[in-house]
Amino acid sequence: MGAVSRVRSQLALGQAGEKAAADFLKRRGYEVVGAGFTARRGEIDLVCKRGRDLVIVEVKTRTSTAFGTPAEAVGTRKRKALAAAASEYRLLAGWKGPIRYAIVGLVSKPDGGFDAELIEDPFQ
């Protein structure tokens, strides 16, 4: 597979993962209010509400766990970028309530579906 094909394949996997994550969260009582918010210093995959909280969701999609779980790919740099993006989102949206974070880790299955894991408040 060439470099361009590999990038297209990764983008398609990521897009499918974000849709699957949104569906997964809806089934668990989250209201998805935004997706793909790009800030100056980071990106938010999904913005949800649950109860009175705004939940900033990082979606990590992988084809296997050979190099660790998807959630393990969220390191310090990504955490800082998420926090910066959340601050910017808060200002632009005028959000005054609490903000929490979550990670949805997805691993693709041979049938085209995903195994999903939700980690709520992963940075505490």
What are these model-predicted stretches?
Residues 1-35:
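Acidic-basic catalytic patches of nuclease active cores, encompassing PD-(D/E)XK
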Residues 8-16, 41, 65, 69-80, ...:
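Residues at secondary-structure transition points
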Residues 18, 43-45, 58, 78, ...:
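Acidic active-site catalytic centers that drive phospho-/nucleotidyl reactions
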Residues 25, 44-70, 74, 82:
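Conserved catalytic cores of phosphodiester-cleaving nucleases, focusing on short active-site segments
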Residues 30, 35-38, 61-62, 68-81, ...:
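Amphipathic, hydrophobic secondary-structure cores in small proteins
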Residues 35-38, 43-44, 104-107:
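Short, solvent-exposed loop/turn elements at beta->coil junctions and helix N-caps
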Residues 92-124:
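Domain-level recognition of nuclease-like catalytic cores that cleave nucleotide substrates
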